[in-house]
Amino acid sequence: LLFARVAFELNYDSYYQEPENLFLTLRTVVSQGEKKEPVCSNYGKLPAAIRENFPDEVEDATLIDLFSRSSLYHEGQEKKDAILATSRSHIFSTLGVKVLSGNVSELDNMDALFISRSLAQSLFADADPIGKTVMINIDYPLTVRGVFEDIPENAEFRFDGVYSFVTRANRFRDERGGWRGDISYTCMVRFRHPEDVEKVAARMPDMMKKYIQYNKDWFEEFSFITPSQFHLQKKESRKIISILSILGFAILLIAGMNNVLISISSLPQRAKSVGVHKCSGASTGHI
């Protein structure tokens, strides 16, 4: 079980289609010559800019705001506590998550909701979920427009449902996601080939000059990392893997030593048994 958990951690985000092409964008602020720690919070318009400026290298890119746990209601009854993300229709092609039903472009519409297969089963049993109304926290109605395949537990960016930024802006009366001030979004990029990553990273500074005015005392650098690498570089992830690996090997060592000790402890009894058989006239082949 310990090694199974280690394997679970090491296989984070291997679920996505062609995971070697999927990358998380990291932003590093350089202020007064000092580099800050890279963070995964980015500008709301960054994915669209990357798609526009690097069409040959980038297959798709999307913005995700992760995540809120919300109570979902159907026909007045609380049905499920679910993790909901805010994104755009690019989310499925970028992450490589299979859409089972519905038109992906409808996710960008007001009050449209896409839900996972297991959430659809939980909410509506075997009934067709398309067109059904779901309430978020009993005060905001959304219409199910599509169903996507479940995202497994060992995924860094796991959600049960997703709705658009247009919907969130209407729900909270708050339009966000520009080039200034609100730098709190996850930017995921799917490259056409892994070798394109360094090319794009090298050209990011020139691209950003189109949108933000930097100076020698303050500017930003951008880099890319796979979701799996992002997960494994976290202190808590490394700690879990190290502790469980040490415990696992310790248990194996103790079990091995126990077997050796049991064998050694049985030697006197074995020798006594051999002696008795010898005294009784048994030959070597009969012992």
Predicted regions and their residues:
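Exposed loop/turn and edge beta-strand positions of beta-sandwich/beta-sheet ligand-binding modules
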Residues: 109, 138, 183-185, 258, ...
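Intracellular coupling helices
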Residues: 257-287
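Structured, solvent-exposed hinge/loop segments at the ends of secondary-structure elements
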Residues: 2-130, 136-143, 202, 209-213
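N-terminal membrane-entry
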Residues: 234-251
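Membrane-helix interface segments
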Residues: 57, 78-79, 196, 237-239, ...
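Juxtamembrane transmembrane-helix termini
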Residues: 7-17, 152, 261-264, 268
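Hydrophobic alpha-helical transmembrane segments of multipass integral membrane proteins
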Residues: 2, 249-256
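Mid-to-C-terminal secondary-structure elements
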Residues: 85-101, 113-237
